[in-house]
Amino acid sequence: MKSKKIFEWVRILLFSAVLIGGCVLGFILSLRPATSESEGRTLTKFPQFNTESFLSGEYTSQISLWYADTFPFRDLLLDLSGDLKGLYGVGDQEFEGYHGEADTLDMNQDFVWDKEPSAPPPTMENPVPPSEEETTSAETETDTSAEEPPVAETIDGYYVKGDTCWELYYYKADLVDRYCRVVVQAALDLDGIATVYDMVVPTSYCYALSNEELQKLGASDGLQTIEFIYTAVDAYCPQAGVTNPVVTMPVHELLAQHKDEYIYYRTDHHWTAKGAWYTSRYFLDAVNRPYPALEEYEVFTYDTFLGSLYRHTQSEGLKKHPDYVDAYLSPNVKEVTIFRDDIYQSRPLIDLEVTSSNKYTCFSSGDHQYYETYNPTIGDGSSLLIIKESYGNAFIPMVADSYEHVYAIDYRFWGGDLVSFVQEKGIDTVLFLNNLMATADDYTVRCLERLVN
């Protein structure tokens, strides 16, 4: 009886010690993380006090959210939680995420340029790129008043099977039409100044999922959608009065020939440097620009990479089979100039010392509103402008050796005047480079519309 009572007291004391220790640990501010490596996001900040939020109860609610979101050793605890779930035997099972609702794609529809204008684009006088730790994909956030732009480039659709995750595309007729009109309007604005090229890059699901799976998930045929976009652009150009029409780049046909190669990550929504390399050569051949052979590039590898799709799903199947990142180091161009924090900064074109979990930021220093490379071995005054989202980050190093000047703007954050910029820099080639997801996302389409309105 006595030993039983001692055991009960020991158990109570141990429980109390753990409880008190956890409380004390939770209040040590120096241990509270500001970012989450495993989720790839900035954690909730401690709220600023004001009387209105205090009286409404919002202030105390935000403190509770901050306390829970920034608990010390948060990532370690998440990893342990994932490991425990893996012991349940569910880690490698098929997992279906959000099922979107796609519009019907009519390949035989009539395209009429003159119609009522769409909704006005967002007004963002000083759009801000994501933090150094973040880079994203085409991106569902629509609140343009937020302190930072959206960090996720998804339309909230994903499909996990085994060690691979795919973003799913849901065709939206109005958004795709607005995307096409932006490209054609840019060609009209730049008519006689520069030739406009349009490259819509398929995402990995386009080559990996069967028609049966697409029907089951309600997802759209991405390759057919790209062909539809190019058909619309070709039809709109003469109606709009463009004398130098948009040149469409059917790289989806090229990438289909290499679909069994490592051209997409399994745990991230981006393409790999190899995928960007194939499409860059297709583009450079079309514009008759020289480029180095693949053997002339030094290859640098990050061995372990768990990307945005892992952070989105926290799938054990992905965690057990991480990606790797190959980066091709240009033989001639080592640096890129970016615009960040209101100043121009020189960064490595390929960063060999990325410390964050998001290794994709090694390409062109991640997401910024403006980029510029200079190749001293070419003195012909040639210049290229890339209008891009984050897929363009891996593309910039692939064309840096082919032009004296390569400029790139991320339309999600850049607020300049397109025509004035092209004229000022003497640019004669403009490339719209977007992954398929960007064409059916309201935020990215509205940001694109700012370029031509």
Predicted feature residues:
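Extracellular glycan-modifying ectodomains
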Residues: M1-N453
